[in-house]
């Protein structure tokens, strides 16, 4: 599918696969509980784990993140360019749905400079949920063909290459720098 077709799927609250910095992600409209539920069922993932949001700029995250405790250093860290994809765990607004945050009062966000993510967010008008495109026992997909093999030939996938990163994103707490996942 092309960008416009994937955007239409997103607007219809469907789950899609799209390329990120290292692997294909499964994503949907984070404002749609029904879309997120489809994603969780597809991934056999507990709602308690919470989800990552990706977008090309911070504006897309502002409806979900509580920035009241952010220092200038926190803003700088969140927006900095790193040698690997970096996801930051930040405080969530009290209005952020539990189907995104799970058992936490925080949410994970990643600025993603992959052109596909940029185009999808700009055309859809929202950030995307992001979890690796793979079934539980299989490795994350790195090509559109691998996505179709795992999820079926008709699964909506944006057939563009992934970025240059070799590993999925590192996940850290923005304030404490605690490492949750090595990148």
From Swiss-Prot:
Its main location: cytoplasm. Keywords: ATP-binding, Cytoplasm, Nucleotide-binding, Nucleotidyltransferase, Transferase, tRNA processing. It is an enzyme of class 2 (transferase). One of its GO terms (molecular function) is ATP binding. The keyword Repeat does not apply. GO terms for biological process: regulation of translational fidelity; tRNA threonylcarbamoyladenosine modification. It is found in: Cytoplasm. PROSITE patterns: YRDC (PS51163). It catalyses: L-threonine + hydrogencarbonate + ATP = L-threonylcarbamoyladenylate + diphosphate + H2O. GO terms for cellular component: cytoplasm. Residues 1-183 form the YrdC-like domain. Its EC number is 2.7.7.87. Pfam families: Sua5_yciO_yrdC. Required for the formation of a threonylcarbamoyl group on adenosine at position 37 (t(6)A37) in tRNAs that read codons beginning with adenine. Catalyzes the conversion of L-threonine, HCO(3)(-)/CO(2) and ATP to give threonylcarbamoyl-AMP (TC-AMP) as the acyladenylate intermediate, with the release of diphosphate. Belongs to the SUA5 family. TsaC subfamily. HAMAP family: TsaC. This is Threonylcarbamoyl-AMP synthase. It comes from Pasteurella multocida (strain Pm70). The gene is tsaC.
């Amino acid at each position: 599918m092309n960008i416009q077709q994937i955007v239409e799927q997103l607007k219809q609250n469907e789950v899609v696969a799209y390329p990120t910095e290292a692997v294909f992600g499964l994503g949907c409209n984070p404002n749609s509980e029904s879309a997120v539920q489809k994603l969780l069922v597809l991934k056999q993932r507990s709602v308690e784990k919470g989800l990552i949001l990706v977008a090309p700029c911070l504006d897309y995250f502002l409806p979900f993140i509580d920035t009241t405790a952010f220092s200038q250093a926190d803003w700088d860290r969140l927006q900095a360019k790193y040698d690997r994809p970096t996801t930051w765990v930040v405080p969530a607004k009290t209005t952020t749905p539990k189907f995104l945050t799970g058992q936490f009062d925080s949410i994970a966000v990643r600025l993603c400079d992959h052109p596909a993510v940029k185009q999808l967010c700009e055309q859809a008008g929202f950030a995307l949920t992001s979890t690796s495109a793979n079934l539980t026992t299989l490795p994350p997909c790195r090509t559109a063909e691998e996505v179709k093999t795992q999820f079926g030939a008709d699964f909506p996938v944006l057939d563009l290459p992934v970025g240059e990163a070799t590993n999925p994103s590192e996940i850290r707490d923005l304030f404490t720098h605690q490492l949750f996942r090595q990148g």
